[in-house]
A protein has these predicted regions:
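Gly/Ser/Thr-rich loops at beta-strand to alpha-helix junctions
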Residues: 7, 26-38, 56, 88-94, ...
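Long, hydrophobic N-terminal alpha-helical segment
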Residues: 1-50
Length: 150
């Protein structure tokens, strides 16, 4: 197990996990997961990147670097060296089952599967350690903070 600290540690840790990959596809919920996929994609923007919204493989879009940062672009294939499942997919209110995710993964050619989540949601949802998904790595980050003021 490798400990990561802060956002920089998260980015560096993720970049290390995918350093040998030429292409990475993120699977996540629109809105909630999209900015995290863009955040993780920025330091690896020289690779072929894609985003699958929810389980809608037909809506896969390229992730492209622009003067504004990472943005979704034209339609593309979801096939990649690495597929990254973002934790929002495992949140109860999203309603994606392990079986549905496994079915989606069966439609995407990939060599490695990585889970990226906050606050242990992939483990809480029972997605870690299940043969149906078979994560090669899971990156979990715990967020803590405070608000000060009046």
């Amino acid at each position: 197990m490798t400990e990561i600290k802060g956002l920089g540690g998260m980015l560096n840790g993720f970049r290390d996990l995918v350093k040998d990959a030429e292409s990475i596809t993120f699977v996540g919920t629109p809105g909630f997961c999209t900015p995290f996929a863009e955040f993780l994609a920025f330091p690896i923007r020289d690779k072929k990147l894609a985003f699958v919204p929810n389980l809608k493989i037909e809506k896969t879009r390229k992730m492209v670097a622009t003067e504004y940062g990472m943005e979704l672009g034209d339609a593309t294939s979801p096939d990649a060296d690495v597929v990254v499942i973002l934790g929002g997919m495992a949140m109860p209110k999203i309603g994606v089952s392990i079986e549905e995710m496994a079915d989606l993964l069966g439609k995407i050619e990939h060599k490695k599967l990585i889970g990226v989540c906050f606050m242990g949601i992939l483990e809480q949802a029972g997605w870690c350690g299940t043969p149906a998904l078979g994560f090669d790595y899971v990156m979990n980050t715990t967020l803590m903070g405070d608000i000060s003021g009046e």
